[in-house]
Amino acid sequence: MNSNGDKLSLSVQNLANTNEITIVQAIGELKKSGKDAIPVLVEALKEEGSLCNIAAAVLGEFGEDASEAAEELSCLLKSHAEDTRMAAAISLMRIGKPSLPFVIKIAQESEGQSCFWASWCIAWIDPSCIEPKMYKCLKYEHEHPSGIVAPFAAEEALGKLIAFQLKDKED
């Protein structure tokens, strides 16, 4: 392991380790690497299970600096795994405006949970971009919960939309 890329790759692989000390050390190594870790983390999004989810979560911590990951993260909104969709959605929300083109496309072209989590992101990033289909999707999840977390997320997003509309009326 001589190159920085190899060290980063090993650190990312160690994120999925079951040993807490190894995970903490891996996070420390990634923090030292800063933005250089982003491409390696994006590559880890292609993995299955916890490594993908942890890589998604770590990317979100970079905020807008991880904008290059937005397209790949948005693809995870189509995952069959709820935890993967949620990890991707939270990271996309943290990346912010650079995520919008990708999440808007997913919300427009998808149904069900993919549309829901994309719409949730949009409500948090820029509520003015919410379209009627997206609003209906959020409302449907709130009224017909599909899981434990999604109805609360729907409630948050609907609250953001209501606050945006009220604020818009004041201006």
From Swiss-Prot:
Disulfide linkage: none
Keyword Transferase: no
Highest taxon listed in the record's lineage: Bacteria
Keyword NAD annotated: no
SUPFAM superfamilies registered for this protein in UniProt: ARM repeat
UniProt record, GO biological process: bacteriocin biosynthetic process
Alphabetical UniProt keywords: Antibiotic biosynthesis, Bacteriocin biosynthesis
Knockout consequences: When the skfA-skfB-skfC-skfE-skfF-skfG-skfH operon is deleted, increased rate of spore formation; a double operon deletion (sdpA-sdpC plus skfA-skfH) makes spores even faster.
Inducing factors: By Spo0A and PhoP, during nutrient starvation, especially phosphate starvation. Repressed by AbrB during normal growth when nutrients are plentiful, in association with the transcriptional repressor Abh.
InterPro entries reported in the protein's UniProt record: ARM-like, ARM-type_fold
Function (record text): Required for production of the bacteriocin SkfA.
More about this protein: Accelerated cannibalism by skf- cells is seen on solid media but not in liquid media.
Annotated protein name in UniProt: Uncharacterized protein SkfG
